[in-house]
């Protein structure tokens, strides 16, 4: 998992409340258990005029020109501004996979659905909860200037707007540690590699019959 320390990126404003996980990545794309390849179908029903299908190429599909990610000024956005209750609905982990695969590093909203919020941290995305009026200010500033960037500083737990206004956010210390160091569940387990080896060696000494080849 990529570490997240400080990120400066183009912000895209998704001005919709209660965006659920089926809107983020529709159900027909959930067959794969690989974490990659979902970006082209992120917000599929909002981005495209037609209904997308698994393994379908998206280059020739008709776009909804009014959707934020289809507008030239927001191409390459890596910070998503959202409204309240983002990520509600089913608990599909494919939702943060799709956001990450598209290129987003952080999502800023007044509130998130709990399971989606937790899944973001496990997949290297930083979900940030700010006050509604602070999110409103970010939306307003991003709309005013093309190419407006937002600075997300995890170490200092601040978000800086395009005008330089700074907003503080809270994050659990353990989750912060994991993101700063790029540690997912596997990475955390590997940190205990020496202790795991010692345990296995002790088990082999205490109960060697458990480790005999089958049939012996």
Swiss-Prot record:
One of the record's GO cellular component terms: 3-isopropylmalate dehydratase complex
Keyword Lyase in annotation: yes
One MF annotation (Gene Ontology) recorded for this entry: 3-isopropylmalate dehydratase activity
GO biological process: L-leucine biosynthetic process
Pathway it works in: Amino-acid biosynthesis; L-leucine biosynthesis; L-leucine from 3-methyl-2-oxobutanoate: step 2/4
Coiled-coil region: none
Keyword match Cell division: no
EC number(s) recorded for this UniProt protein: 4.2.1.33
Catalysed conversion reaction: (2R,3S)-3-isopropylmalate = (2S)-2-isopropylmalate
Endpoints of the signal sequence: none
Family annotation (InterPro entries): 3-IsopropMal_deHydase_ssu (IPR004431), Aconitase/3IPM_dehydase_swvl (IPR015928), AconitaseA/IPMdHydase_ssu_swvl (IPR000573), IPMI_Swivel (IPR033940), LeuD (IPR050075)
UniProtKB keywords: Amino-acid biosynthesis, Branched-chain amino acid biosynthesis, Leucine biosynthesis, Lyase
Family annotation (HAMAP family): LeuD_type1 (MF_01031)
Function (record text): Catalyzes the isomerization between 2-isopropylmalate and 3-isopropylmalate, via the formation of 2-isopropylmaleate.
Family, per entry: Belongs to the LeuD family. LeuD type 1 subfamily.
Cross-referenced NCBIfam families: leuD, PRK01641.1
Subunit structure: Heterodimer of LeuC and LeuD.
Alphabetical list of PANTHER family matching this protein: 3-ISOPROPYLMALATE DEHYDRATASE SMALL SUBUNIT (PTHR43345:SF5), 3-ISOPROPYLMALATE DEHYDRATASE SMALL SUBUNIT 2-RELATED-RELATED (PTHR43345)
Protein name per its UniProtKB record: 3-isopropylmalate dehydratase small subunit
Organism: Marinomonas sp. (strain MWYL1)
């Amino acid at each position: 998992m990529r570490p997240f320390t400080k990120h400066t990126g183009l912000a895209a404003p998704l001005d919709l409340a209660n965006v659920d996980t089926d809107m983020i990545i529709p159900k027909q794309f959930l067959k794969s258990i690989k974490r990659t390849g979902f970006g082209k179908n992120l917000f599929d029903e909002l981005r495209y005029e037609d209904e997308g299908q698994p393994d379908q190429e998206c280059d020739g599909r008709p776009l909804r020109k009014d959707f934020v990610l289809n507008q030239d000024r927001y191409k390459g956005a890596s910070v998503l501004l959202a409204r309240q209750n983002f990520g509600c609905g089913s608990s599909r982990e494919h939702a943060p996979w799709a956001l990450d695969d598209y290129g987003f590093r952080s999502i800023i909203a007044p509130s998130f659905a709990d399971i989606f919020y937790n899944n973001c941290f496990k997949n290297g995305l930083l979900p940030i909860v700010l006050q509604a009026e602070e999110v409103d200010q970010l939306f307003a500033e991003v709309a005013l200037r093309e190419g407006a960037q937002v600075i997300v500083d995890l170490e200092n737990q601040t978000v800086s707007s395009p005008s330089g206004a700074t907003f503080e956010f809270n994050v659990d210390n353990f989750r912060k540690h994991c993101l700063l160091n790029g540690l997912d569940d596997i990475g955390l387990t590997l940190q205990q590699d020496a202790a795991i080896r010692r345990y296995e060696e002790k088990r082999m000494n205490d109960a060697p019959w458990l480790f005999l080849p089958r049939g012996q």
